[in-house]
Amino acid sequence: MEFPDPPWLNQFRASTNSFLSQYEPLTLLLSPLFALLLAQILQSFFLVIHERGLKATIISWCLVLINTLTLRSRSYIGGNEHEGHFSLINEACSMFAHTNPLHLSVFPSVVRFEAEVVAMTAALLGSKEKTSGGQICGNMTSGGTESILLAVKSSRDYMKAKKGITKPEMIIPVSAHSAYDKAAQYFKIKLWRVPVDKEFRADVKAVNRHINKNTIMIVGSAPGFPHGIIDPIEDLGDLASSYGICLHVDLCLGGFVLPFARKLGYPVPPFDFTVQGVTSISVDVHKYGLAPKGTSVVLYRNHEIRKHQFVAVTEWTGGLYVSPTIAGSRPGGLIAGAWAAMISLGFEGYLENTREIMEASKSIQKGIQDIPELFIIGRPDMSIIAFGSDVVDIFEVNDVMSSKGWHLNALQRPNSVHICVTLQHVPVVQIFLKDLRDSVQTVKENPGPVNGGFAPIYGAAGKMPDRGMVQDLLIEFMDSSC
């Protein structure tokens, strides 16, 4: 949830508005001139800063002020600050902030940290089981997208070496993460999207129909980002094995929840390297692993596949060069922070976190089901709960929830929103459900766009038949935002 503005700030705003209202005509006349003058003063100020720099104490004060005024929401990685979790990983990041694992011999400690993070993550996903083959290996990356990009690139090159495929194709369900679209564009791979079934799981028969001589890989999610539903990984594994192609499982959300949910007795279908046919897995440590942002892991069933991830250059005048991931230099501080997070929490810590998260998720799911105007999308397997409505505009409900401080993700096909339950939600489940009930009632009684809301945009975008136009609008939006 968002935190309310401090009382002094609200009082200042009220006093300012009251004062200006007395001189409204003059204010309207002079405000453009004042704005121009202020812009010139700020421009001159920043030019001086860029040339001369600022003292550390002033920078620290500025950061605190910016954090107070603008960063009003808590972070996604809701660790337990009372036990010093954030302080610990911040200290680890700071201690190794200037290290770079690209230079293996210069920073051996960071290289060791990475190896241990990979090994601990792999152990959660079946590396110690005989059915895994005993060769699970991998690397840390900057996030789930890079992990997926590397898995796709490695699969493409592995299948080229193994089968001679030069016009690669991959098959994904429509619920798969958009990182696969990015990979297809980057690596010149033809992308086939297949529908999901009535339970919003990947349609295995549809996947089978699209497999041909150029297919390099198929994809499953555990769970999928939109609806929190696990694809039939075993069935996809059977397909991959029978055709001799790769199967990547996206565990970016589930990697640090599903192994523990299974341990707690929740009905979790198979999803890891114990499933024959799975050749690679992506899992984010910076989500439910509670590591600093910018830490993920990509894993492979064996070294033969992973070798196709690497880039080696022999003819550069700068010397021999080899790099394991897309980035050359990598921040060793983040690797150290991830290591510290995992070592600190341990199996028992993650188990207890999962217990609380899953209990909160089930309570929220039941609470949503009890709201007659709403319905749950499919049967959520984890802590992501998507819901829609045939009675009210769900995007208008989302806008009202946003005004109350809740930030939910808007989805399409069907129109819906989802909540991704974290530790931050555990103590406020009933507050969330009350706000949701009130928001639904507000929209039901007063339908129509919320001032400043995004419902009209989402609604219009979903109805536009020309998806190329929507794509152009997204690109223009991004170009103007960064």
Predicted region positions:
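Active-site nucleophile and cofactor-binding loops and adjacent substrate-binding regions
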Residues: 106-110, 138-145, 172-174, 411
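Pyridoxal 5′-phosphate
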Residues: 197, 212, 218-219, 450-460
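PLP-dependent aminotransferase-like
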Residues: 159-216
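Conserved beta-loop-alpha segment that forms the PLP phosphate-binding cup at the N-terminus of a helix
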Residues: 114, 118, 134-165, 179-183
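Active-site C-terminal subdomain of aminotransferase-like
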Residues: 216, 243, 248, 260-383, ...
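Non-catalytic terminal extensions of PLP-dependent enzymes
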Residues: 1-111, 115-119, 123, 128-131, ...
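Active-site phosphate-binding strand-loop segment of PLP-dependent enzymes
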Residues: 202-249
